[in-house]
Amino acid sequence: MEIVKSRFKRVCVFCGSSSGKRECYSDAATDLAQELVTRRLNLVYGGGSIGLMGLVSQAVHEAGGHVLGIIPRTLMDKEITGETYGEVIAVADMHERKAEMARHSDCFIALPGGYGTLEELLEVIAWAQLGIHDKPVGLLNVDGYYNYLLTFIDKAVDDGFIKPSQRHIFVSAPNAKELVQKLEAYKPVNDGVIAKSRWEVEKKVQQPQQQQQVVFCSNTSMQTEIAL
């Protein structure tokens, strides 16, 4: 397998805890995993072992890539069944899950998914719009799955709710290879955003007490608990 050099180290993938009704979604998850491995990129994801989450994490892990899953303790019984792959960090809630996924990642990719995937995607886009981060965000538009979302965003631009320049805060493509190429070439949109340094200073001033995390290191069932 030919290795392709990347400017990233860790990619956060948002995706469904369901596999969807069509095989193209599972194929896209497997293709994305292969693209990550080809570029020696580590995977950060929502920690589940079911649906597209399970497929992409298994494929990356079995190909020799590093996998980090981050999941709220409350969801562990629902989203983890059987084997897990790589390292899994249990956190307190959904807010901490998203914050930790963002902190551990250099860019973001959304596969098809439901409300949760959409919420995660739109939040990191909003963070980019506000200048909280300047990391690339990519939408894997498998067989037109996100066409209506893209149409909605175009409508928001046309009606003056999103600046035309900020329409390009994220990129989209129909396949993993093209999408990752666009992410590699991405340059941050700096039109009207608040300086990232101001957010970082405010975060240090208001830094909350760190929550306890539990780490599960396993490629079978959850076996080892380490309190941090």
From Swiss-Prot:
It comes from the Eukaryota. Its EC number is 3.2.2.n1. GO terms for biological process: cytokinin biosynthetic process. Substrate binds at E79, R97, K98, G114, Y115, G116, T117, L118, E119, E120. Pfam families: Lysine_decarbox. GO terms for molecular function: cytokinin riboside 5'-monophosphate phosphoribohydrolase activity. Coiled coil: none annotated. Keywords: Cytokinin biosynthesis, Cytoplasm, Hydrolase, Nucleus. Expressed in roots and shoots. Detected in vascular tissues of roots, cotyledons, and leaves, axillary buds, immature and mature flowers, fruit abscission zones and ovules. SUPFAM superfamilies: MCP/YpsA-like. Disruption phenotype: No visible phenotype under normal growth conditions; due to the redundancy with other LOG proteins. Cytokinin-activating enzyme working in the direct activation pathway. Phosphoribohydrolase that converts inactive cytokinin nucleotides to the biologically active free-base forms. NCBIfam families: Rossman fold protein, TIGR00730 family. Belongs to the LOG family. This is Cytokinin riboside 5'-monophosphate phosphoribohydrolase LOG5. The gene is LOG5.
